[in-house]
Amino acid sequence: MASKSTDISAIIKDRIRRFDSKIDYSEIGYIVTIGDGIALVNGLDNAKNGEIVKFKNNITGLVLNLEEEVVGVAIFGDANMLSEADLCTRTGEVIAVPVGDELTGRVINAIGNPIDGKGPINSTKRREIFKVAPGVMSRVEVNEPLETGIIAIDSMIPIGKGQRELIIGDRQTGKTSIAIDTIINQKDKNVKCIYVAIGQKNSTVAQITKKLQDSGAMEYTTVIVSGASELAPQQYIAPYSGTAIAEEWMSEGKDCLIIYDDLSKHAIAYRTLSLLLRRPPGREAYPGDVFYLHSQLLERAAKVNYSYGGGSITALPIIETQQGDISAYIPTNVISITDGQIFTRENLFHSGQRPAVDVGFSVSRVGSSAQIKAMKEVSSSLKLELAQYNEMQAFAQFGSDLDDSTIAILKHGHKVYELLKQEQYYPINQLAQTAILLGVKEKIINPLPASQLRRYRDEVIKFMTKELEGIKIGEKIKQNNNALNSSIKEEITTHLVKIVNKIIASLHDYKPEAELPMPAKYLEINNV
C-alpha cells in the first residue's frame, strides 16, 4: 500500500515538474445580430475603432461602431457562414495589407489576397490602410509632368506628379478609357500604377486587366478589385488598400499613379455601411462625414521631400454624374478636394469627339508648372483659340453672312478639334505632341482639309519617333532643357511644311480655294 502511494506521489511530482502550460488570455464576444455584412457583437468591451476581429472559418471583420452594449463590425468574407451566438475574438491589430514589389503584376482583393490564380504573394511587409496624410512641411511643389499620352489633356489640362486630378462625367463617356490610356502611357517611364475597381462588373475588370496585359502595362501595375457582387465593407476599404500600397513605393522614392474607379460607388458603399450601422443620415442620405471619407483618402496623394522618401502619388479619382449635374453632393465634394477636373460630356462623345473632354469646363490647378517648356510654348494659346471657335460657332448657327476673320477662326478651330481626336490605347509621346501642336500654333496646317489631319498627325508621330532626323530633334529639345529655340523650331517647321505639302500632293481632288493659305514665311520651303 505504501509503495503504491509512493508511486502515485512520484508520478504527480514528475507531472508537476514537466507542467508548462501558458495561460491563453483573449477577449471573446458573441454575435447578437447579423445581416447585410454587418454584425453586432456583445462582450468586446475593450475593442478599438478600426481593430480587426476574428470569427470562425477564418473570417475577419473591422470594428466600425463602438456602442455601450455592443460593437458594430463590418465583415470581410462570406457573412452567410456566420450566425447569431457565434464567437468573435479580438486580435489587437489594425487592418493592414501586404505591400512591396511582389504586388506588381498581380490582381488582388480589397484585403490584399490574390485572386488571379498565380499563387500566394510572398511579401514580408504589411502596411496599415488607414493612415494620416503627409503634413504640409513634408510636401514639395508639383513641378514634374505626368504624361497621359492624350494630346487634349497634356496640352491644356496638364497633370503633374503628386497632383489629384478628377475625371468626372456621365456614364459611358470614356472616363475609364482616359485612366487606362494614362496607365498604358507610363511604360518605360518608371511609374508604378495601381488601378482600384470599386463596384465594377467582374467582366469589365477582366477586360481591363486583359488590355493591360496585352499592352505590357501589367509589368508595372497592380489591380485591386472590389466588385459589384461584394458587400459594402470590401468596397469601402478598397481605395485605402490601394493607397497603402502606393505609399510604400512613395516612401522608397518611386513615383506612383493610382486610379479610383469610381468614388461615386465608394460613397454609396459607405452610405450603405453607415445606414446599416444606424448612423444618422444627412443630405441625400449620406452620413455627415462623407466629405472626410474622400478628403482623408485624396490628401494622401502628394509629392514628398527627400526626408520622407522623395516619391510621389498622383491620384486620378473618377466620379460619375447624372445628366451632367456636377452640382450634386458627391461631385461638388470631390471637386473641392482635388486639384482640377477633366470633364467628359455625353454630347461630345456621341458626336465623335473622343476623348470627349470639355476643354472649357476642365481645368488643372497646377497648370503649366507641370509641363515641359516646349509644350508650354506651343499650347499656350490653344484654349483661347477653342474658346473663340465655340463662341463664333454659336453666332454662325444663325446663318448670317460671316466676315473673313470669323471664317478663319471657325475653320482653324474645327481643325484643332479634329487634331484633338484620338483613338483609345493610342498614346502619343510628349515630343511628338509638341511637334503636332507647333504646326497648329504656326498655322502650318491651314491648307490641309479637315479629313487629312489624322494623316498629318500620324506622319508627324512617325517622323518624331521612327526617323533619325526626328529622333535627333527630340534629343536636341531634351539637351536644351526641354525647351524650343529658334533653330530647333526652324528644323521642326521645315519638316512639318514638307509633310503638309506631301499630303496635299497626294490628293487628286484638292481645292486650295476651300482652305486657308499657309503663312507666307513657309511658302518658300520647297515641296517634297
From Swiss-Prot:
Keyword set includes Ribonucleoprotein: no
Site (described: Required for activity): S362
UniProt keyword annotations, A-Z: ATP synthesis, ATP-binding, Cell membrane, CF(1), Hydrogen ion transport, Ion transport, Membrane, Nucleotide-binding, Translocase, Transport
Keyword Ribosomal protein: no
Catalytic activity, reaction form: ATP + H2O + 4 H(+)(in) = ADP + phosphate + 5 H(+)(out)
GO cellular component terms given for this protein: plasma membrane; proton-transporting ATP synthase complex
Residues that, per the record, bind ATP: G169, D170, R171, Q172, T173, G174, K175, T176
InterPro entries named among the record's database cross-references: ATP_synth_asu-like_sf, ATP_synth_asu_C, ATP_synth_asu_C_sf, ATP_synth_F1_a_nt-bd_dom, ATP_synth_F1_asu, ATPase_a/bsu_AS, ATPase_F1/V1/A1_a/bsu_N, ATPase_F1/V1/A1_a/bsu_N_sf
This enzyme's EC code(s): 7.1.2.2
Topology of this chain in the membrane: Peripheral membrane protein
PROSITE patterns attached to this UniProt entry: ATPASE_ALPHA_BETA (PS00152)
Subcellular localization, as worded in the UniProt entry: Cell membrane
Family annotation (CDD domains): ATP-synt_F1_alpha_C (cd18113), ATP-synt_F1_alpha_N (cd18116), F1-ATPase_alpha_CD (cd01132)
Task performed by this protein: Produces ATP from ADP in the presence of a proton gradient across the membrane. The alpha chain is a regulatory subunit.
Subunit and partners: F-type ATPases have 2 components, CF(1) - the catalytic core - and CF(0) - the membrane proton channel. CF(1) has five subunits: alpha(3), beta(3), gamma(1), delta(1), epsilon(1). CF(0) has three main subunits: a(1), b(2) and c(9-12). The alpha and beta chains form an alternating ring which encloses part of the gamma chain. CF(1) is attached to CF(0) by a central stalk formed by the gamma and epsilon chains, while a peripheral stalk is formed by the delta and b chains.
Record family assignment: Belongs to the ATPase alpha/beta chains family.
PANTHER family: ATP SYNTHASE SUBUNIT ALPHA, MITOCHONDRIAL
HAMAP family: ATP_synth_alpha_bact (MF_01346)
Protein name: ATP synthase subunit alpha
Lineage of the organism: Bacteria, Bacillati, Mycoplasmatota, Mycoplasmoidales, Metamycoplasmataceae
Gene of this entry: atpA
